């Protein structure tokens, strides 16, 4: 039986990473943003929300970027089925040699799989440069009911920000439109090999609303508006609407002196509806 394949004998993360990298014959790639989780306590920050999902009956998952399997193999002890999508084919091949039968390791692009996945649960210690794209892909995929994501701490702050806060952004609008987001934990750089230059945060997402095609236009307007987040919202939105070929709605002037960073996600949806006609 391969190491880590039983539900009772969990491998230490550092030992597992060492073995998988040895089997793959590779060193971490800066180009691919590879940082491997080697701290068992940090692995637990990801496992706790996965165990909660499993207890609620969500037992099939997609993992984006399993790397050396630090989260994959422990997660297989609580989930019935995992499809793990790894971009690096050497890592995918090495991990597949150690993974239990309930884990299917495939080579591919994680963002594309996130958008098309049939699994109700997605988890990922995300490559930092892909975090926003992964979140957007998950938002659009209404089959995804929940997600557990490791992201750069600053991105986590934006994902969980509320209107009026310093970190509020287009990403905040996107997440809030369809998910309930919570900061579940923080992972220090020392938990990774090699060490990243930033803190990692574990964010949980729970779907609270289905994605609507209307939201794409709402996010387009939000993206335009947040390029001038400290300006008066009515003036900025008027320019954004005109650039999109839409007539500003009569209620736009009622925003008064409100700034862009004070607008609610629902305000952008209302603008998108007005733009639609």
From Swiss-Prot:
EC number: 2.1.1.-
Gene3D superfamilies: Vaccinia Virus protein VP39
Location relative to the cell: Cytoplasm
Binding, S-adenosyl-L-methionine: 35, 37, 65, 86, 109, 125
Pfam (any one): RrnaAD
UniProt entry keywords in alphabetical sequence: Cytoplasm, Methyltransferase, RNA-binding, rRNA processing, S-adenosyl-L-methionine, Transferase
Any GO molecular function: RNA binding
Cited function: Specifically dimethylates two adjacent adenosines in the loop of a conserved hairpin near the 3'-end of 16S rRNA in the 30S particle. May play a critical role in biogenesis of 30S subunits.
Protein name from the UniProt record: Probable ribosomal RNA small subunit methyltransferase A
Organism taxonomic ancestry: Archaea, Thermoproteota, Thermoprotei, Desulfurococcales, Desulfurococcaceae
Gene: rsmA
